[in-house]
C-alpha cells in the first residue's frame, strides 16, 4: 500500500481546505462554530460571539472550555471514595472491589453521585455582544464563514438597522480569544458574564441563579486592560481583558461586565488562565497572524486526501466531513489531558473524559502523520499511573488498570457499567505503537520507546493477570467484564470477540516493545497469546456477541449498540483467532439486520474498516455515508447523535482513522486505495498517510 501520487500531481491543500469552509446564512442552533487550540475552545453563534446563548442551549451550546477549568461542589457530608466500592465475585478465587452506582437511597447512593458529578468541567465565561433589546429573530443578512485555512471566523449581519462585521480567532499557544468588531452607525459593546456550574450530566454548565455562590472581582485595571478574578468554592481562575480602541469597562451587575467602545470599532482580546496573568495579552493582529501561521503549518504538514477527481456523487460530502473532522479534532482533542466526548464545546458526563474513547479521538492523528497531537496527551498516563496501579491492586491484579470515566486526577467515576469495561486498557499500547511508527527517525523512536516502555509493560502485566486460565480446555478466557458492546452483563459475559482480538494484538505488541528495548519476550505472555480462545461462532458461521451469548441472533439486546465483533478485524489486524469467512458472514448479517437505530457515530467507521480489510470497498464507502441519525454530520462538521449528544467527536476521529486505512491500507496490504471501489468513480488522491498495523 505504498500507493501515492507522483510529485507533479501534488494536492493543492489550500484549495482543498477552503472549498470545505462552512458558511452560515441563518440562525440555526446546531450550526455554532468554534475556534480553539487543542486545549481551549470558544464556540460562537452567528454574531461571531456568544450573544444569544439561550437560543443555542439545546443545540450546540456556546461554550468557553479548557483542559484546566474544573470545579467541585463542597463535600459537606465528607463522602469517601471507599463508600462507592462494592464486592463482586467473578470466579477468580477472590472478591474484587468495583466503584459502582447504588439504586437504593442512602449514603452510598449519595457518595457515588457526588464522585460522578465532581469534579466537573467549567464554562469559563460568556463573551457576547451587548444588545439588551435584540432577539435572534431581529437579525438579517447573515453571512458567516469559518476559514479553516487561517483558523478565523468572519461574519457580517444586520441587527436593528446596524451592520456588523466581526472577526473571531483563538491564539494557538494561549487560552486567548481575539475579536475585531466594526459596527456601522453604532458604538459596539461587549459583555462578559460568568455563571456558576450546574453539575448536570449534559448541558452548557451555566447556572445563572446562584450569584451568591461565587465571586468575580476586578483585581487590576489600566487604561486599556483589566484582570478579573473568579472564585468558585475552591476553584480560582483569571480573565485578562485588553482593548485597542478607546473603551470603558463597567460592572453592570454581579458577574456581568460591559466593555463599551467610544467609536464604531472595538478590537479586544480575552485570555483565560488558571494563574494570575503576568504577561500582557497579544494584540488582535498578533493573534490573527499567530493563528494563521499555526493553521497553515497544520494543513501543509501531515496527510491530505483529495476527492475532487472522484465522479461518485457521494465523494463531495465525504471530503467535507473529512476536512471538517480534522479541524474539529485539532481544536478540541489535543491537550495535556484526554478529550471528553463533546470536546471543549459543552459538557457530557459532567465534562469528564472516557478512556475507552481516546483511541477514537486520537489514533487518526498518528496515522495522518501528526503524532505530536497525541504526544501532548500520553504523558498524562504517567501522572495517573499510581491511581491505576491502586485500582489493579484493589481488585487483585498485577500492573495498572486504566480507569474508564475520569478527570485530570485520574480518579474513577463510579459506574455500574464503566467500572467493568476493559477495552480502554490496550489503547495505551496501540497509541504508543502508532506514535512510534509515525516517527521514522531512530532518535525519535528511541525517545518514544524510553518514554512509554514502562507504561506498555505495566499495561500488559494487568492484561496477562486479567485473563483466566481454563484448565479443562487448556485455553485463556476473558470474563467478569462488560465488553465494548455494553448491552452485555459483567456477571454473564465470557470471551467477547473484540476484547479477545485486542488482547492478542496488544500482548504481541508489548512483546515487540520488549524486543526493541533489547529485553527477552516474557514466556508466560507468549503462552497467553498462543492459548487465547478463538472467537465463538454459531452453526451458521456467524460470530457471537460473546461465547456466553449463543442466542446472539435471536435477542435484540445482542444486535443493538456497538457491533463490536466487527472491530475484532478492522480496528485490529487479522490474527489466528479470526476466521475471515465467518467474519464476512457476520459483516453481511450486521449490514442487513443490525438494530442501526441504536448505534453510535464510530460504529460506521468501524464497519468501514472491517469491510476494507475483508476486501469489500463498496461496503466501506457505503458504511461511512449510511443515512442514519447517528451518522449525521452537521454544517459545522459535528457528528450529531441525539438530543443529548448533539456533537460526538469519537465519530469524527473514527472517520479519519477509517479514511487512513481505506487509502494507505495496513502492513502487508498491496492493493492501492483498498477501501475504495475500483469502478472508475473513486480517483482518490492522497499524501503522507501511515499504514495501520
Short names for language-model regions:
Residues 109-138, 650-691:
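Catalytic cores of secreted or luminal carbohydrate-active enzymes
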Residues 338-352, 402-418, 479-496, 630-645:
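Acidic/His metal-coordination segments adjacent to aromatic residues that form catalytic metal sites
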